[in-house]
Amino acid sequence: SAVCIPSGQPCPYSKYCCSGSCTYKTNENGNSVQRCD
């Protein structure tokens, strides 16, 4: 009954994203963070 994580939000694994895809992106501080696509 877990709610999926929306696009652009931090994610631990792809399976938790509404889109089913969680990839590394560079944030405004230049750090690499995983976010839902």
Curated annotation (Swiss-Prot):
The record marks P10, N27, R35 as: Critical for insecticidal activity. GO terms for molecular function: calcium channel inhibitor activity; toxin activity. One of its GO terms (biological process) is defense response. Keywords: Calcium channel impairing toxin, Disulfide bond, Ion channel impairing toxin, Knottin, Neurotoxin, Secreted, Toxin, Voltage-gated calcium channel impairing toxin. Its main location: secreted. Pfam families: Omega-toxin. It comes from the Eukaryota. GO terms for cellular component: extracellular region. It is found in: Secreted. Disulfide bonds join C4-C18, C11-C22, C17-C36. Expressed by the venom gland. InterPro entries: Omega-atracotox, Omega-atracotox_CS. Belongs to the neurotoxin 08 (Shiva) family. 01 (omega toxin) subfamily. The presence of a 'disulfide through disulfide knot' structurally defines this protein as a knottin. Inhibits insect, but not mammalian, voltage-gated calcium channels (Cav). This is Omega-hexatoxin-Hv1f. It comes from Hadronyche versuta.
